[in-house]
Amino acid sequence: MAPEQWEATSQVSLTFEDVAVLFTRDEWKKLVPSQRSLYREVMLENYSNLASLGFPFTKPKVISLLQQGEDPWKVEEEGPGGFSLGLKCSQRTTKSTQTQDSSFRELIMRKSKRKEPWNMKSENLSIHEGKLEEKWDVNASTIERSYKSNELSPKSHREKRSSECEKQISYLSNPLGITPDKRYKCSMCEKTFINTSSLRKHEKNHSGEKLFKCKECSKAFSQSSALIQHQITHTGEKPYVCKECGKAFTLSTSLYKHLRTHTVEKSYRCKECGKSFGRRSGLFIHQKVHAGENPYKYNPGRKASTSLSGCQRIHSRKKTYLCNECGNTFKSSSSLRYHQRIHTGEKPFKCSECGRAFSQSASLIQHERIHTGEKPYRCSECGKGFTSISRLNRHRIIHTGEKFYNCNECGKALSSHSTLIIHERIHTGEKPCKCKVCGKAFRQSSALIQHQRMHTGERPYKCNECGKTFRCNSSLSNHQRTHTGEKPYRCQECGMSFGQSSALIQHRRIHTGEKPFKCNTCGKTFRQSSSRIAHQRIHTGEKPYECNTCGKLFNHRSSLTNHYKIHVDEDP
């Protein structure tokens, strides 16, 4: 199109006033900061779109103000309506109708909630430049003819101009006529998105691209928002605080779930026994008790049956991947695959230092820190470092003293629900973690893992000072205190300090007189379990300690040590 033709058509087709949205002073005051920000975004974007099409107009003053981050009006420049755009108007009178303001308010409220754009970005317009010019030729000539036929009747023109300009604005917003709901489709899984940025973020899930790396632990993420959320684990920051009880959380979603404990009644009721729950997930888990096992089986990777009733259908939308072995459900197929390794025993992630294998890459990364000595999670109170966020969270309880979960049997307060479950097994006698080699059972999986190292001979924890190795991290920590001389456990009664917490517990029994270990044969009690075991050999006649020189047997190690002195004295 020739420049003179562009100039002619632009005078009668579309000016910046046509796409500008006006607010009065009172209306502007009612907008919250996020809505004002969205207003700036839309105005600048509309101006950019018009400028990219070559419209011959000078930059309006409102655009200059918005680009500088200022409000779109100055007090001294206010017009009678309380708002001045600072525009150079054309022949026609630009009016801010109540309908237009109301429409924008609806749009701005809707976008602030849904986080969706109104129109296509300027770069998308340039992609379809050829089609844009073709469409513009048609619309420009149509509007020009309309203008000539009505140029003697300004009122008639203004009425028709409104509908024609709306068409042009609609075209600028969506040059290809694509529906605004879902425009962009992923070529890998055919999932659709409303904008290109969402599509690009989604495509990183397929490509595995992770551009955002944590400087503390080197963990990489595909999105910057995920990195920001992860970095809170290092700083220990908990910006979301419950106003009811003061408990703090790292995520807003965690705070939202917690608030339900204060505000939401137990509205999810089991039809079988009448028990109520505060969350649907609690009811869903409880219903498995009645069902015995989940009857809706499926092939791995396929979604579970949706032919469920009542609240189960709600959960099938949230957790749709079902494990055939135990009936647990998961939100994604990848979570199901990770879980199934528990049943199959598959451990594809192997440590290059000690050869230990893991079912998940995150477990391997955490394990490797044992060898490197890296402790990226640091306590903000005392500066102590930890290899995992879970260990840091457990440590923080020392400073805060928070204990929210009480045992119904003994009243003991515990800091987490998982700790409470393990503690309750003391009362029930349940030991679900069983060693496949010797059959010995344990209350928790960590105790089983440590026990299994007795069979494998694995000692992954090494002292950097003397090179001595240990089966568990706590043994290494206790040993390292022999080098440093550190004794952090102090008795409040007498002031005596100890290098191990177990030594302090045993020492306290001297002050309290407590002897919890009782011999079943004679009823004698002892402060230590080892003392009871040694005592019971009197009844059984067991003598496990043998002298290598003369073969004599003893029931105590100390007796064997004293016996060795006889042979030492006999040597010339």
Curated annotation (Swiss-Prot):
<feature type="zinc finger region" description="C2H2-type 10">
    <location>
        <begin position="461"/>
        <end position="483"/>
    </location>
</feature>
<keyword id="KW-0863">Zinc-finger</keyword>
<dbReference type="InterPro" id="IPR013087">
    <property type="entry name" value="Znf_C2H2_type"/>
</dbReference>
<keyword id="KW-0479">Metal-binding</keyword>
<feature type="domain" description="KRAB">
    <location>
        <begin position="14"/>
        <end position="85"/>
    </location>
</feature>
<dbReference type="InterPro" id="IPR036236">
    <property type="entry name" value="Znf_C2H2_sf"/>
</dbReference>
<feature type="zinc finger region" description="C2H2-type 8">
    <location>
        <begin position="405"/>
        <end position="427"/>
    </location>
</feature>
<keyword id="KW-1017">Isopeptide bond</keyword>
<comment type="similarity">
    <text>Belongs to the krueppel C2H2-type zinc-finger protein family.</text>
</comment>
<keyword id="KW-0539">Nucleus</keyword>
<feature type="zinc finger region" description="C2H2-type 13">
    <location>
        <begin position="545"/>
        <end position="567"/>
    </location>
</feature>
<keyword id="KW-0862">Zinc</keyword>
<keyword id="KW-0010">Activator</keyword>
<feature type="zinc finger region" description="C2H2-type 5">
    <location>
        <begin position="321"/>
        <end position="343"/>
    </location>
</feature>
<feature type="zinc finger region" description="C2H2-type 3">
    <location>
        <begin position="240"/>
        <end position="262"/>
    </location>
</feature>
<feature type="cross-link" description="Glycyl lysine isopeptide (Lys-Gly) (interchain with G-Cter in SUMO2)">
    <location>
        <position position="238"/>
    </location>
</feature>
<feature type="zinc finger region" description="C2H2-type 7">
    <location>
        <begin position="377"/>
        <end position="399"/>
    </location>
</feature>
<feature type="zinc finger region" description="C2H2-type 6">
    <location>
        <begin position="349"/>
        <end position="371"/>
    </location>
</feature>
<keyword id="KW-0804">Transcription</keyword>
<feature type="zinc finger region" description="C2H2-type 4">
    <location>
        <begin position="268"/>
        <end position="290"/>
    </location>
</feature>
<feature type="zinc finger region" description="C2H2-type 9">
    <location>
        <begin position="431"/>
        <end position="455"/>
    </location>
</feature>
<dbReference type="Pfam" id="PF01352">
    <property type="entry name" value="KRAB"/>
</dbReference>
<feature type="zinc finger region" description="C2H2-type 1">
    <location>
        <begin position="184"/>
        <end position="206"/>
    </location>
</feature>
<comment type="function">
    <text>It may play a role in renal development and may also be involved in the repair of the kidney after ischemia-reperfusion or folic acid administration.</text>
</comment>
<keyword id="KW-0677">Repeat</keyword>
<dbReference type="InterPro" id="IPR036051">
    <property type="entry name" value="KRAB_dom_sf"/>
</dbReference>
<keyword id="KW-0805">Transcription regulation</keyword>
<keyword id="KW-0832">Ubl conjugation</keyword>
<keyword id="KW-0238">DNA-binding</keyword>
<dbReference type="GO" id="GO:0006355">
    <property type="term" value="P:regulation of DNA-templated transcription"/>
</dbReference>
<protein>
    <recommendedName>
        <fullName>Zinc finger protein 354A</fullName>
    </recommendedName>
</protein>
<dbReference type="GO" id="GO:0003677">
    <property type="term" value="F:DNA binding"/>
</dbReference>
<dbReference type="Pfam" id="PF00096">
    <property type="entry name" value="zf-C2H2"/>
</dbReference>
<dbReference type="GO" id="GO:0005634">
    <property type="term" value="C:nucleus"/>
</dbReference>
<dbReference type="GO" id="GO:0008270">
    <property type="term" value="F:zinc ion binding"/>
</dbReference>
<feature type="zinc finger region" description="C2H2-type 11">
    <location>
        <begin position="489"/>
        <end position="511"/>
    </location>
</feature>
<feature type="zinc finger region" description="C2H2-type 12">
    <location>
        <begin position="517"/>
        <end position="539"/>
    </location>
</feature>
<keyword id="KW-0217">Developmental protein</keyword>
<feature type="cross-link" description="Glycyl lysine isopeptide (Lys-Gly) (interchain with G-Cter in SUMO2)">
    <location>
        <position position="155"/>
    </location>
</feature>
<feature type="zinc finger region" description="C2H2-type 2">
    <location>
        <begin position="212"/>
        <end position="234"/>
    </location>
</feature>
<dbReference type="InterPro" id="IPR001909">
    <property type="entry name" value="KRAB"/>
</dbReference>
<feature type="cross-link" description="Glycyl lysine isopeptide (Lys-Gly) (interchain with G-Cter in SUMO2)">
    <location>
        <position position="121"/>
    </location>
</feature>
